[in-house]
Structure formats: C-alpha cells, structure tokens
Amino acid sequence: MLRKVVRDARLRARVLERVEEFRLNKRASERVWFRELVLCILTANSSFIGAFTALQYLGDLILYGSIEEISSALKNAGYRFPNLKARYIIESRSYYGKLREIGRVADRDQIEAREILLEIKGLGMKEASHFLRNMGYLDLAIIDRHILRFFSDYLEDQKISSKSKYFELESVFRSIASALDLPVGVLDLYVWYLKTGKLAK
C-alpha cells in the first residue's frame, strides 16, 4: 500500500511542492522561524488544526504580548492548556535571534540541532523534529500518532515510552525510507497522507 502511494505521480508532485516550501523556509526571516517554533510548541498534546487556529488568534502576541494576553487569546481560540502554553511561549522568546543559528547547526548535523531544541520548554522529540522539518531539514522522523498507527502494521510495541524508544522507531522509519529511496521527512508526508488523506502538516 505504501509503495503504491509513493509511486502515485500526482501525489508525488504535491509532495515535492510541499517539500520545496519547507526548503524555502531555510532562507526565511527569524520572525518566520520563531512563528514556526511557537506552532510546534502549540502542537504538543493538541491537533495541528487546533494549534494552527490558536496561532492565528495570537498573531503578534507571540512576540509582544504578556503572559495574560497570550493565555486569554488561547482561551478564546478554544485551545487546551492556555496558561501552560502561554508560559512556554514567553520563555521561548529567549531563543528569538538564535533559531537561524540552530539552523546552521542543522546544516551539518540535524540530530545535534534537535538536541539543542530539546532545551526549549514545550518541545519534545516529535516537536523538535517537526520544527526542523518545517524549516527544510528532512532527515528526522516526526513520530506522531499517525506514524505510530503506521508502525502498528509492522511492530508489536510501538509506544514511545522513552527517548531511546523514539530513536529505535526513528531508525526503523529511516530504514523504510532508505528502501524507498526517500528522505525520512518526505516519507513522513506520504505516511501522513496514507493515514489521514491529507498532505498538510
């Protein structure tokens, strides 16, 4: 089934277009990088649609709003954990101006760049990988519930109980990507489509 999806010429064109959008983000401003960081903080324990909607409500508050203003905007967006995420967003501002530097680390070693991102409160392995993929770095797996559902077809134990388990599943995903001659981040788009019928992520 996966191989059939990967061979679909029309879908491949859409995937490559999406990948090009990610790669263009590498050259984007620090403001764009920070917006993507906040989006990834918001996606933790939330749906992408819920996180994206919340980000639209926030607007420039991510840069200039107080913790109370951010929390209020998140509540108005119907977002879960508004107080916690407001605090994470405020604290993440200390990385504004440093994110493209992390990108330069990713140019030589994406795993090292992900480790740096893990120091940001609100980011786990999945969210840090998601951020890097959205900024054009395609060698890391975003192991979310859709990818775990994909793994359930092949593996008995696919729960992420630790960082080492994430690495283990990422290694399996990397092997599948290699067999299909695809970067890990591109295979992720195909699997996401296979499990949701959608391409955006």
From Swiss-Prot:
Record-linked CDD domains? ENDO3c
Q: Which reaction does it catalyse?
A: 2'-deoxyribonucleotide-(2'-deoxyribose 5'-phosphate)-2'-deoxyribonucleotide-DNA = a 3'-end 2'-deoxyribonucleotide-(2,3-dehydro-2,3-deoxyribose 5'-phosphate)-DNA + a 5'-end 5'-phospho-2'-deoxyribonucleoside-DNA + H(+)
What's the short name of a Pfam family annotated to this entry? Ogg-HhH
The UniProt site entry described as Important for guanine/8-oxoguanine distinction is assigned to: 201
The UniProt entry, under InterPro entries, shows: DNA_glyclase/AP_lyase_Ogg, DNA_glycosylase, HhH-GPD_domain, HhH_base_excis_C
Q: Which GO terms describe its biological process?
A: base-excision repair
What keywords would UniProt list here? DNA damage, DNA repair, Glycosidase, Hydrolase, Lyase, Multifunctional enzyme
Cross-referenced NCBIfam families: PRK01229.1
Q: What is this protein called?
A: 8-oxoguanine DNA glycosylase/AP lyase
Q: Gene encoding this polypeptide?
A: ogg
